[in-house]
UniProtKB/Swiss-Prot annotation:
Entry's Gene Ontology molecular function annotations: ATP binding; ATP hydrolysis activity; RNA binding; RNA helicase activity
InterPro entries given in the database record: DDX47/Rrp3_DEADc (IPR044765), DEAD/DEAH_box_helicase_dom (IPR011545), DEAD_box_RNA_helicase (IPR050079), Helicase_ATP-bd (IPR014001), Helicase_C-like (IPR001650), P-loop_NTPase (IPR027417), RNA-helicase_DEAD-box_CS (IPR000629), RNA_helicase_DEAD_Q_motif (IPR014014)
Organism, as annotated: Gibberella zeae (strain ATCC MYA-4620 / CBS 123657 / FGSC 9075 / NRRL 31084 / PH-1) (Wheat head blight fungus)
EC number: 3.6.4.13
SMART domains given in the database record: DEXDc, HELICc
Gene: RRP3
Quaternary organization: Interacts with the SSU processome.
Keywords: ATP-binding, Helicase, Hydrolase, Nucleotide-binding, Nucleus, Ribosome biogenesis, RNA-binding, rRNA processing
Positions that bind ATP: A104, E105, T106, G107, S108, G109, K110, T111
Protein name, UniProt field: ATP-dependent rRNA helicase RRP3
Extent of motif Q motif: 60-88
Domain (Helicase C-terminal) ranges: 286-434
Region of interest: Disordered: 1-58, 451-486
Hydrolase among keywords: yes
Gene3D superfamilies: P-loop containing nucleotide triphosphate hydrolases (3.40.50.300)
Length: 486
């Protein structure tokens, strides 16, 4: 389907009857959360209480935080008018030379929160290989590199992005030019540390781990341990994440010195007040028809559909395109160029539906997402928070709707318990939903045919879809560790 924007699917309407105008039931506006918790820790900066924020106070500027004129000018050019809460709390602490554990929801401005202090320190004492940023996915690493280049545009910053799935030779050449900042996925960075002559992190001054909880998952643990042996002990270390875990606490004890915990979220499973969350309890065989109904209801809006597997991501995207929607898949079996292409099309609005595995749920810079649809529920509450955090960002409103079948009840109840509230059911009329049934069944038939070739291609050892270069043999390498789905 080459059309850029999605169009509404015509419902099957009985002959000689006029379509009934669909009046959507009034939906309650989301209410701001009133549950505030406080932690009394000497080295913890928490978000102010409602009483404190009720007092009208002038907004702080980046200059007020201690950011120098050159970087303030870069912020102004990027339309960063005022610091976000995580920036306001972490930048002054970072400029004091402290290690930081930063806890904030996705979309809160974490990248600038750690980039600005690093760039300011670099301006004071310029040197190559000054800072290293580790990210769990290739897309997030690329995004962070772009943010550093934008913020450092007025100071001649050199930044190298080192990720798996791309040729190592150009990356080695980029490292040979002695960039100020290196942004990398763990597996590929270890490859260069072990194989690229002349590349060393002995002079490193800053180590940043973004989405730190995922970096410390089992797959990345050995690579992180190796990297820590290559970096000097005398350095500043920042860990930024949406959640904290026992693994992060272990890393804190091992590699951070007297860190300050900066948090703007008092609840581990808190979602923003502008996010309207609903569920639909449906029979499992009716997931597709209800998905199409919801997509049609939100036609023209930027939407992410989350699925659990690579196979389902591909099938659902084919189903949607067959029905005339501008959908594009994003998963770890795509080549790096295809993944970046999918993200760029979605960001630019060329495609307004992204069907994705959880590779898209964390950290990626997608400025405006109106709707999140959980076609498959995630396996845990933390992943649910990260998924729905794709929408309702930067004060905007958003909608998140989850399809819940008889097989998902246990997971769904755990999610509600973590959120501390019961979600409202999304109002539907059965007749309106089932009006799509015949067209959905035909699209399912076409999708099954197309998925045969996808399954055959995926079955080849080391294959990478859409032009990617596979490895010989089935051995799992570090590039696979930089890829979330396999």
């Amino acid at each position: 389907m080459n059309g850029a924007k999605r169009r509404k699917v015509a419902q099957d309407t009985p002959r000689n009857t006029k379509p009934v105008a669909q009046e959507k039931p009034a939906r309650a506006e989301p209410k701001p959360s009133s549950d505030e918790e406080s932690e009394e820790e000497s080295a913890t900066l928490e978000e102010p209480s409602a009483e404190e924020t009720a007092v009208d106070a002038p907004k702080k500027t980046f200059k007020d935080l201690g950011v120098n004129d050159a970087l303030c000018e870069a912020c102004e050019k990027l339309n960063y008018k005022y610091p976000t809460p995580i920036q306001e709390k972490s930048i002054p602490v970072a400029l004091q030379g402290r290690d930081i554990i930063g806890l904030a929801e996705t979309g809160s401005g974490k990248t600038a929160a750690f980039a600005l202090p690093v760039l300011q320190a670099l301006l004071d004492k310029p040197q190559p290989l000054f800072g290293l940023v580790l990210a769990p996915t290739r897309e997030l690493a690329t995004q962070i590199g772009q943010a550093f280049e934008a913020l450092g545009s007025l100071i001649s910053l050199r930044c190298a992005v080192i990720v798996g799935g791309l040729d190592m030779v150009p990356q080695a050449i980029a490292l040979g030019k002695k960039p100020h900042i290196v942004v990398a996925t763990p597996g590929r960075l270890v490859d260069h540390l072990e194989k690229t002559k002349g590349f060393s992190l002995r002079t490193l001054k800053y180590l940043i781990m973004d989405e730190a909880d995922r970096l410390l998952d089992m797959d990345f643990g050995p690579s992180i341990d190796k990297i820590l042996k290559f970096v000097p002990r005398e350095r500043r270390t920042y860990l930024f994440s949406a959640t904290i875990s026992s693994k992060i606490e272990s890393l804190q004890r091992a590699s951070l010195r007297d860190p300050v915990k900066v948090s703007i979220s008092s609840n581990k499973y808190q979602t923003v007040s502008t996010l309207l969350q609903n569920y639909l309890f449906i029979p499992h065989p009716q997931k597709d028809v209800h998905l199409i109904y919801l997509i049609n209801e939100h036609a023209g809006q930027s939407t992410i559909v989350f699925t659990r597997t690579v196979w389902e991501t591909q099938r659902v995207s084919i189903l949607l395109r067959t029905l005339g929607f501008g959908a594009i898949p994003l998963h770890g079996q795509l080549s790096q160029s295809s993944r970046l292409g999918a993200l760029n099309k979605f960001r630019s609005g060329t495609r307004d539906i992204l069907v994705a595995t959880d590779v898209a749920a964390r950290g990626l810079d997608i400025p405006s997402v109106d709707v999140v649809l959980n076609y498959d529920l995630p396996q845990d509450s933390k992943t649910y928070i990260h998924r729905v955090g794709r929408t309702a960002r930067a004060g905007k409103s958003g909608v998140a709707i989850s399809l819940v079948t008889q097989y998902d009840l246990e997971i769904y109840l755990r999610i509600e318990a973590a959120l501390g509230k019961k979600l409202a059911e999304y109002p539907t009329e059965k007749e309106e939903v089932m009006a799509f049934q015949s067209r959905v069944e035909e699209a399912q038939r076409i999708a099954r045919i197309e998925m045969k070739s996808f399954t055959e291609e995926r079955g080849k050892k080391g294959s990478t879809l859409k032009g990617g270069r596979g490895k010989k043999g089935g051995k799992r390498g570090r590039d696979d560790m930089d890829r979330e789905e396999g």
